[in-house]
Amino acid sequence: MKYEKLEPAAIDETVAGLVGWTLAADRLSISKSYKFRNFVEAFGFMTEAALTAEKLNHHPEWFNVYSRVDVKLTTHDANGLTDHDVKLAKAMEKAAARRAD
């Protein structure tokens, strides 16, 4: 699959629309830390996100400790951000919202 890297203006617009996501200084990735009530909620989020990632064939870099999940999204094949990163970030936002206090 060929991935098209987002243009700089599209990156700025995209990140502005993703609440809580941070653009890396090199502009090649976005990241966010999620905090849940407990490990079960965090793992449920990761499971839901993993199923979406499989459907998109686009997988996150992430790290989990108890109720926290740190996520980094980039498209290695494009050496930067693509629409796949945006789709996965939006899906993660929906998954996290379903677990909100």
Swiss-Prot record:
Keyword entries, A-Z: Lyase
Enzyme Commission code(s) on record: 4.2.1.96
InterPro entries: PCD_sf, Pterin_deHydtase
Catalyzed reactions: (4aS,6R)-4a-hydroxy-L-erythro-5,6,7,8-tetrahydrobiopterin = (6R)-L-erythro-6,7-dihydrobiopterin + H2O
Lyase listed as a keyword: yes
Gene Ontology molecular function: 4-alpha-hydroxytetrahydrobiopterin dehydratase activity
Disulfide bonds listed in the record: none
One GO term (biological process): tetrahydrobiopterin biosynthetic process
Identification of the protein by name: Putative pterin-4-alpha-carbinolamine dehydratase
Family designation: Belongs to the pterin-4-alpha-carbinolamine dehydratase family.
